[in-house]
A protein has these predicted regions:
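Generic intrinsically disordered, low-complexity segments enriched for polar/acidic and small residues
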Residues: 1, 16, 52-54
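N-terminal helix-turn-helix DNA-binding core of bacterial DNA-binding proteins
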Residues: 12-49, 71-83
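Extended, hydrophobic interaction surfaces within ordered domains
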Residues: 66-67, 83-85
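A detector for short, charged/polar N-terminal pre-domain segments
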Residues: 1-13
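Canonical helix-turn-helix DNA-binding module
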Residues: 42-68
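Short amphipathic alpha-helical surface micro-motifs
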Residues: 1, 57-61, 77-78
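Histidine (H) residue identity feature
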Residues: 6, 55-56, 75
């Protein structure tokens, strides 16, 4: 499995962050991740299609909001809190 690409903290752009948060589904993902330290994609999907959730997680990763790592066959997500402060 390919590792996920995450932009370095120095490359975070406010407009991308705000765009990522402008979608209600992505905002909900971020809010739920703020309540826990880490969660799998399945724990955050809310019954939505996997393809839609993959898109939303990619937008959040590209904006620098979320860190995703593979643990076996599960993708675990966490907020990049320190990079966003």
């Amino acid at each position: 499995m390919r590792p996920f690409k995450h932009p370095p903290a120095s490359d975070l752009i406010l407009e991308r962050v705000l765009y990522a948060l402008s979608d209600p589904v992505r905002l909900e993902i971020v809010q739920r991740l703020a309540e826990v330290s880490e969660a799998s994609c399945g724990e955050l999907d809310g019954g939505r299609p996997k393809s839609s959730m993959s898109h939303h997680f990619r937008v959040l990763r590209d904006a620098g909001l979320v860190m995703t790592k593979s643990v076996g066959t599960t993708h675990m997500n966490s907020l990049r809190r320190s990079d966003l402060d």
